[in-house]
Amino acid sequence: MKVILASSNKGKIKEIEQMMHMDVIPYKELLGDLEIVEDGKSFKENAIIKAKTIYDALGDKEAVVISDDSGITVPILGDEPGIYSARYAGVGASDKENLYKLINRLKEKGIKRTPAYYTAAIAIASKYGIDTVHGWMWGEVIDEARGKKGFGYDPMFIPKGFDKTLGELDEEIKKSISHRAKALELAKIILKRWE
């Protein structure tokens, strides 16, 4: 089974390969700079848009495209950054720029620590149609970055039941509790049907 990943984010590619125990091909290796307009109103809609766009562009009925749309939501900030997590500080912004924009938004509001959650929506496009699964991780965000591990908003997110940020936790712990890991476990069940 040829599995194409609808991402060029190196951190996400590595994480998905490790969790799925399979090699994936980043879509840009096959399609270059294919334009994908993520104009959905939810993580699920954006994951479907990415998976379907890439699957259709490949023209290979035997290919399987896995797309993930994920992000962090902070209810007290009106659910920011939500579906805009990857471009919170602007289109083309780095993980660090997005992280510090959220930290600064908390500081502007005088918030040191508040509930937040990560969502991962995964869409799988194949000759069988499109399947979707979700995973969530609950916790809190803090107004500072702690730790060097992980990527994205990890240095400011403390998962429920822990006193360290994802940026401070060992990779194995993060993998066992993450929103993406939960969604990928469900995605594996779908993929096993086709083996």
From Swiss-Prot:
Keywords, alphabetical: Hydrolase, Magnesium, Metal-binding, Nucleotide metabolism, Nucleotide-binding
Cofactor entry: Mg(2+)
Residues the record marks as active site: D69 (proton acceptor)
Cofactor note: Binds 1 Mg(2+) ion per subunit.
GO biological process, one term: nucleotide metabolic process
Residue spans crossing the bilayer: none
Coiled-coil intervals: none
Gene3D superfamilies documented for this protein: 3.90.950.10
Catalytic function, reaction form: XTP + H2O = XMP + diphosphate + H(+); dITP + H2O = dIMP + diphosphate + H(+); ITP + H2O = IMP + diphosphate + H(+)
GO cellular component, one term: cytosol
SUPFAM superfamilies: ITPase-like
Family classification: Belongs to the HAM1 NTPase family.
Oligomeric and partner information: Homodimer.
Protein name: dITP/XTP pyrophosphatase
Protein species of origin: Nitratiruptor sp. (strain SB155-2)
Lineage, opening ranks: Bacteria, Pseudomonadati, Campylobacterota, Epsilonproteobacteria, Nautiliales
